[in-house]
Amino acid sequence: MSHEKAQKAQKLERDKEMERDNNGTGLIEKLLRTDDQSEDINKLCDIVRETSFQIHKFLRSGHLEKIYESALTHRLTKMGIPVIQQHELGVFDEDGTSLGRLCVDLFVANRLIVEVKACRAVVDEHIAQLLGYLRASRIEHGLLINFGGQRLQIKKYILN
């Protein structure tokens, strides 16, 4: 089997899995529940990654960050995955005092922060920004996605 046919077969299999798992429960519905979060967050990240690749293939590089952010929001929402664009999260001191608010690019399914970039390369400040968002919000999982280069860059970060 050629590499291209193998990729198409894998994509078809992923699409089928997204529609239904073995129990007949829709994957999207399953992702929205909080039972098995470790497996579900990985599936959610896979969906966001695959969707990002599709967007990058279609739009390529050269657009503003906002365009990629909107495209990702649109496509994930079409799949039934809740996404909040430019979501504000509170930052609190150890005694609970509000220190202010921060704004994440995308907050996906109430458990994944996605920081979108459209630059030549990811730099330490971009990573620090996402890690700061994760720490401040106490969300464990984040994706840093850069649409700005010739090749799409996606990096997952997990806070323990």
Please name every model-derived segment.
Residues 24-25, 81-84, 121-129:
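A cross-kingdom feature that marks ATP-driven nucleic-acid transaction machinery
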Residues 60, 83, 104-120, 133:
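Conserved catalytic cores of phosphodiester-cleaving nucleases, focusing on short active-site segments
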Residues 77-93:
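A short acidic/basic microdomain associated with nuclease active sites
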